[in-house]
Amino acid sequence: MLSMFMYNNIVDYVDDIDNGIVQDIEDEASNNVDHDYVYPLPENMVYRFDKSTNILDYLSTERDHVMMAVRYYMSKQRLDDLYRQLPTKTRSYIDIINIYCDKVSNDYNRDMNIIHDMASTESFTVYDINNEVNTMLMDNKGLGVRLATISFITELGRRCMNPVETIKMFTLLSHTICDDCFVDYITDISTPRDNATTNSSTREYLKLMGIAVIMFATYKTLKYMIG
């Protein structure tokens, strides 16, 4: 588990983000002549996933490129520092998730692209996405569906136009995905055992990934067809 010091730092960081959003909303409202306009709460803001959105479209001057480079460097240093502070067990779980989620993305790249394209045509709130994921996980207890969901949500996060809201989405969905089933699977995989047994079990789990992708696509297609 994270140390209390690290936990407090993370909580403070999230609180700073929340306070900044609230302050931005209040500042914007005070400068707006239409004081009856109600600004949406951050957690209810809509995610718009646009496949054509490219960060390069917003970088037009040398200053823009330099500022982006600085922001990237600072973000990377913060993440690298957090990784170094994590306990060995946490880092081992990160390695496991990296390996298997990369496998999902590679093996089911075409199917997942179809779903990404479908998601790009619609708008969601963070709760819409979380409810759909929660419903899917309740109906399927396999490891594959959870790994496929992580890959899918990660890809959606890359397409989200609002970085702060992306952080909020990842935070909420990490709680949803990390249910008892997922914790049991990951801890089981990380436990040293006979390689043949491990590989056999993993193959069975990974078979569910294709089913997970089809389930998600079918669910979303029916939802939008029915309205």
Curated annotation (Swiss-Prot):
GO terms for cellular component: host cell mitochondrial outer membrane; membrane. It comes from the Viruses. Induction: Expressed in the early phase of the viral replicative cycle. It is found in: Host mitochondrion outer membrane; Host cytoplasm. Pfam families: M11L (PF11099). Keywords: Host cytoplasm, Host membrane, Host mitochondrion, Host mitochondrion outer membrane, Host-virus interaction, Inhibition of host apoptosis by viral BCL2-like protein, Membrane, Modulation of host cell apoptosis by virus. GO terms for biological process: regulation of apoptotic process; symbiont-mediated suppression of host apoptosis. Belongs to the orthopoxvirus OPG045 family. Homodimer. Interacts with host pro-apoptotic protein BCL2L11 (via BH3 domain). Interacts with host NLRP1. Interacts with host BAK. Plays a role in evading host innate immune response by inhibiting host inflammasome activation. Interacts with and inhibits NLR-mediated interleukin-1 beta/IL1B production in infected cells. At the host mitochondria outer membrane, interacts with the BH3 domain of host BAK and prevents BAK from binding active BAX. In turn, host apoptosis is inhibited. This is Apoptosis regulator OPG045. The gene is OPG045.
